[in-house]
Amino acid sequence: FCVENGIGWNDTFEDDTVHDDYRIDYMRANIQSMKDAVDIDGIPLMGYLYWGCVDMVSNGEGEMAKRYGQIYVDADNYGQGTMERKCKDSYYWYQKCIQSNGEDLK
């Protein structure tokens, strides 16, 4: 298994979502590398667990500014906000990737 794989970023909420192409690019590159490891090198990869489906407090920095999830949470570094959740672009990209069993990385 490839586990706890993700990227933290200071996401910006705009147009009622987060346009996180940098997260999509990161995930695409990692998934392609896993596919290559299986197809070219014969590695018996059983699964991939992306780390941080929902934004959470950063373990290293103790703040919300650096976000890891594919779902935005309206909260600041002090726990203030509506706690409303909104799917980021990466959520929809990963949904499509999963539905295709990793074949659609566009």
Region roles according to the model:
Residues 1-106:
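Non-catalytic scaffold segments within catalytic domains of secreted glycoside hydrolases
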